[in-house]
Every structure is written in structure tokens, then in C-alpha cells.
């Protein structure tokens, strides 16, 4: 029987609902419970797959190929025993699309289709389905309490809490305690009004997570409890931390897990063992020294556009006991700049992306890394550009390009994938006329790594499974020419022999991959490719001293 914890936010956005929810999930998992998480997004887009990174940040790809909210990345990084799927994230757009399709088919037998019950029933069905087979499902509602877009979700939560009952549901509400410097005190009124807004919907919070920059004394906690109908011990202070990976320990010290276990009747559970999290925090806060990675992209003004890459580099720093400082380099600006901006870098990374804008700047950075023996990692488009750069400057194909940028190029090193097998082994076919949304090669795919290559050495095995998100791929017609020039194809897809990884054997560390290894990195386990990349950056750092 699944128990549900619903997570809402009030006062302002960006309070950290996803991180707080994931920290609670990690705490419950540490007590032996089987936990999953769900994110409900109120926007009308069917999914974030076609949204600009400047609007939404990163699109996180699950193993089964869902394009989801970046919060699902937090969920997977904090949980070890649960992987997110298509069931774990849905939007208003997805719900309305489903309901309208049913109406067109006549499923409602001519009845009037309304928000209540049709939209709310669809939301409830999705929540219950996602929670099947788990002890606890933590469900985050995007946006802020009071937003008009989230009202159907709030009503669905209210109904579920009534239908499932007190012993199977809880509501955790995040709020802000602002500090007024002129009065030298924390203000509780915004929290009171936020809870009042919840109560007007018919929802009583059970736990309050109070975000603040300052310590909160017992009197303030009692005041909050009095005016919000919450137990004083359920008023939890979440003070700004040096790293988000300190949050599980902070919640543990305030007995959040005990509150939940008591409510749900979970008895005889072991105490939470947070040793792994303590080790992560210790390594993060006490690095031996700093290495610098230049990340060359076109969305660098918004670091959330590369959230999983940023986190994977952080995790690699943990594994190598160094601090990884990311120097963001605007690829478009680099096209007209001198490469001297890259001279302080111990390693260079070109992440994924779409479109021609900024590609010449990225290739300029790739060429610099190749010619100056700087460790280089290319991801998705980063691999495609590494191949094009090598073809232009080493393999004698000066007009090499991708058909994404130039359909009439003389040397189409990169072309549209027209056929591939998806994660279920089903044939997928695409053309230039296909819709943009949901039409890429998505999700986990198996690859075979070539024996004797650095990539195989890094992974330590012949077959790997990594997640993909792309429409274009290296053209196999040019494999022989590229390899004769000195670049090695070090990995192929198991099903269609598509190029998955390339490397330069004569370079100290130059690897580029078509997939997205950042999606499977975690703070406790890291990822072998990123760990090896930062190890190479350490070597480069020592050489340059």
C-alpha cells in the first residue's frame, strides 16, 4: 500500500521544493523504505522537450525516453533504488491532451467535460499509477500556492487526501521566512498567509519547511505553529547550506523521518545511515585544490541549462578530492575572440545543444584542446563538432559540416538518423518533415566499446547503457577516412552500428560521446567518464604549475 507525501511551495518561487522533496526521499530510503517521486507541472506544454533552455533550464531524459523537468534529475541523484520514468512527470498540457482525446473518441458518452471531475480524475489516476509498488511516493506540485495554473492540481491533491485518508497522506509545504534588516527580525506573516491560502483550498499542511538565511529560535517556531495549525516539532528550519547535499542530514537532525514514519505507521525500521552523505559533504567542503573546466556553450548565461553536466562535474570532483570550478564560455562570442580565454583551463568541455548558432566557436575550442593536449570531453553535439573539426583540419575535408547546418555540404560528416530501435526494441523512423516534439532518439541505448580504446578502459567493460537525446549522428560513410586520419571510433550502438564514441589515441585525453553520461551521474557514485575526465584535468593542472 503506497503512502503519499504532497509537496507545495508558497510566498515565492525557487524555494527548492525539488531539493527538499529529494532530501526527504533520500532520508526515507536510508531507513529501508522503497521510495519514488513525481513532479506535476502546471504549464500547458505537453512536455519540456521543445522549450527553450532559457525558459525552462535543462531537459532531463529518463531511461525510458521521457523528456522531463530538471527536478527529476535531482530525484535520481538523491535516490539509489528508484529510476524515474514517463510516469514520474506530467504537465497540464499532457492531462488536457489526454482528456480531449478521450472526449473526441466519445469515451465520456456525450457528457459535459469539466475540470472537476474529468481533469482532476486524470491527475489522480496518474499520481496513483506512478506510486504503485512503492512504500512512499513524494509528489511535488510545481509553481506557487495561489497560482491559477496549479488550481486543478491542488484540488486533485485535496481529493486524494480525503479519499486515501489521514494514515496514507501528508502535505509538506515550503515557505519563506524573510529577514528584515531594519527591524533585525525574521517575519512570519508571509508564511501565515501562504498557509491561509492552502487552507482556503481545503488543505491543511502537516509539515512546514521554512527556508531562511538565519537561525530560527524556539519562540518563532512556536508562533508559526500556533498560526498555521501545525505541531511545533513539524516546523522544520531549512537554513541556507554550503551544499545541497547537507540537506538530508539537516532534516534528519530535526526528526523529519520520524514524523513521517509515525504518521504512516512504519515501525521497526532501522535508523537512517547517512554515512555516504556525510562522506560526500566532507569531500566537497575539503578539496585538495581547484581545477578549472571551460564549458563552451550557447546557453551559458543560464547555468540551469546544463544542470546535470554541472552536477556530474561536481560529482567527479568529489571522486578526485578536488573542487571543480566551471568557467562558462559563450560559444557565439568565442567565434570573434582570441582563444586566450581558454588558457587558464585545465580541461575543456563542449556539452549538447541544437542548431548552428555558436558552433564555430565550439569548434574553435575543440581545435585548441586538440592542438594543445588539453583534456577534452564532448557530449552529443560536442561529439558531432569534434568529428567535423577533425575532418576539416586533419582529414583533409575543409568543407565538412552537418546536414543540420548545411543540407548541401560536400562532406556531410553528420546526418539525420532516419531509422533506429528504441528502448523497447521497436523500429522508429523519422524524416526532416517529422514534428520536433518527442521525435528524437531518446532514452537508454546499449553500446559496444572497442577493445584497446581509452573509452573502454575508462568504463572498464565492453557493453554500456547510456541515455540519448538527438536527431543527428555521424555518417558511417566517413568512418574509414576519419580513422585513417588518426581519430578512433571507440564505440558503436549495439543495434544499428551507429557511432557512439570517438577518441584521439595520440592525445592525453580526448573523448567525445553521442550520448548524455551526465544523466546517470550521482553524488555518491559519480560517473566513470566524468571521473576520468577530471582526473586528466588534475594531471594537466599539475603540469601547468
From Swiss-Prot:
Domain Glutamine amidotransferase type-1 residues, every copy: 292-543
Keyword match Metal-binding: yes
GO biological process: 'de novo' CTP biosynthetic process; pyrimidine nucleobase biosynthetic process
Enzyme Commission number: 6.3.4.2
GO cellular component: cytosol
Annotated Mg(2+) binding sites: 71, 140
Description of activity control: Allosterically activated by GTP, when glutamine is the substrate; GTP has no effect on the reaction when ammonia is the substrate. The allosteric effector GTP functions by stabilizing the protein conformation that binds the tetrahedral intermediate(s) formed during glutamine hydrolysis. Inhibited by the product CTP, via allosteric rather than competitive inhibition.
Family statement drawn from the similarity comment of this UniProt entry: Belongs to the CTP synthase family.
UniProt xrefs under NCBIfam families: PRK05380.1 (NF003792), PyrG (TIGR00337)
Name of this protein: CTP synthase
Species, as recorded: Acinetobacter baumannii (strain ACICU)
Gene this protein is translated from: pyrG
